[in-house]
């Protein structure tokens, strides 16, 4: 399976990523994060993503920190749009890592070689997961996807966004919810509201559906 992502979006070094998270007011002990980022940098390849475990920072605490330029003249004038979770996903934190996306038992870890999965546009999650695992890759979780957008907002582009199928919700009966989380840009319609046009959003798609503008994000592994 070939893997692609936006060639213009490059992750900064882990120490710079740590400073970005600190600047957002997310970190109780900045020096501890700096030390851990420095340690992880010696054990991971360039282009890796620094992530705080979702037990520390769940998706509901991160989504509103995403930012994208407002569309049109407003964006040219410096106006930005704040991220949000769609109104019919109040259970966003119930979407947890699956057996295909096992997280390290650490508050801070690294995702190696995250890719947006552009080559899987028009694939359903059900079709994409076997191809990912056959290629030795692991699907990104929602929290990992949000971290990626916090570090490199340009990874969410018009007509080139992505699903994070490493996160699923388990129903009380043990079955998996048929929704799968995704990150894309609001069109400002419906319950999103016109004021959110152009904003990065956490939403969901059906497990069996295909979308021409949504890739299936994956990684080489986690450390």
Go through the PLM ranges and name each one:
Residues 1-138, 145-223:
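A binding-site-centric feature that preferentially detects glycan-recognition modules on secreted/surface proteins
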């Amino acid at each position: 399976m070939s893997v692609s992502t936006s060639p213009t979006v490059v992750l900064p070094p882990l120490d710079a990523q740590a400073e970005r998270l600190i600047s957002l007011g997310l970190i109780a002990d900045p020096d501890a994060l700096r030390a851990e980022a420095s340690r992880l940098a010696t054990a991971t390849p360039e282009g890796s993503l620094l992530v705080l475990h979702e037990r520390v920072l769940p998706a509901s605490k991160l989504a509103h920190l995403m930012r994208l330029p407002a569309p049109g003249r407003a964006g040219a004038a410096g106006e930005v749009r704040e991220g949000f979770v769609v109104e019919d996903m109040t259970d966003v934190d119930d979407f947890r890592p699956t057996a295909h996306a096992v997280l390290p038992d650490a508050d801070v870890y690294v995702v190696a070689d995250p890719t947006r999965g552009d080559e899987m546009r028009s694939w359903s999650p059900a079709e994409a997961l076997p191809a990912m695992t056959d290629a030795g890759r692991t699907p990104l979780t929602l929290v990992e996807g949000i971290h990626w957008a916090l570090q490199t907002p340009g990874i969410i582009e018009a007509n080139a966004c992505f699903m994070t199928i490493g996160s699923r919700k388990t129903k009380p009966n043990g079955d998996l919810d048929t929704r799968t989380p995704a990150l894309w840009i609001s069109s400002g319609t419906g319950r999103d509201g016109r004021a959110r046009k152009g904003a990065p959003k956490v939403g969901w798609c059906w497990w069996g559906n295909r979308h021409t503008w949504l890739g299936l994000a994956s990684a080489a592994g986690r450390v």
